[in-house]
Amino acid sequence: MATQQVDSRRQVAAEQVAAQLLERRRGSHCDDEKQTLLALLILVLYLSTEIWGSSWEVSERIRECNYYQNLAVPQGLEYQTNEPSEEPIKTIRNWLKEKLHVFSEKLEEEVQQLEQLAWDLELWLDALLGEPHQEEHCSTYKSHLWEWAWALGREHKGGEGLLEISLSGAEL
């Protein structure tokens, strides 16, 4: 009978935690929009920093190209054209390609990490809410679920149940 009371307390506590998480999930639509806008702002700032952050290097290369052309002028080898020199354009193009390639690789890694975290969170919430999930993603999910189940099974003093369990104990 005592185990039934403990089990019912745990079930009630689990339902309360699940309801709180679900309510946070529903009520955070505005927060999600704010976080999305903040992420976009950070992305734009990061892009502008990556593209223009080392622009002094490009400017220095352009000055070097112009310097060598200007050295030829006093020697009577005057070279004038209305078209811009191809060398600085190639330098800038190569620099931009390089920076954009590095940025796209970093961005792809970040997106993959975020997708993995979202997947883990979804599985964790499904397990918490008792919803069946057809496929298990990987062994880390099983180990995290085991940690979470172990945390549920611990005895808590004062009869508080799950409310004392921090989410860090059931890491995602």
Swiss-Prot record:
Transmembrane segments: 37-53
PANTHER family referenced in this protein's UniProt entry, alphabetically: SMALL INTEGRAL MEMBRANE PROTEIN 23 (PTHR37865:SF1)
Membrane topology: Single-pass type II membrane protein
Keyword Membrane: yes
UniProt keyword annotations, A-Z: Cell membrane, Coiled coil, Membrane, Signal-anchor, Transmembrane, Transmembrane helix
Keyword DNA repair applies: no
Coiled coil: 96-128
Stretches in topological domain Extracellular: 54-172
A GO CC term attached to the entry: plasma membrane
Top-level taxon of the source organism: Eukaryota
Full protein name: Small integral membrane protein 23
Record localization: Cell membrane
Topology feature Cytoplasmic, residues: 1-36
Pfam families tied to this protein: DUF4635
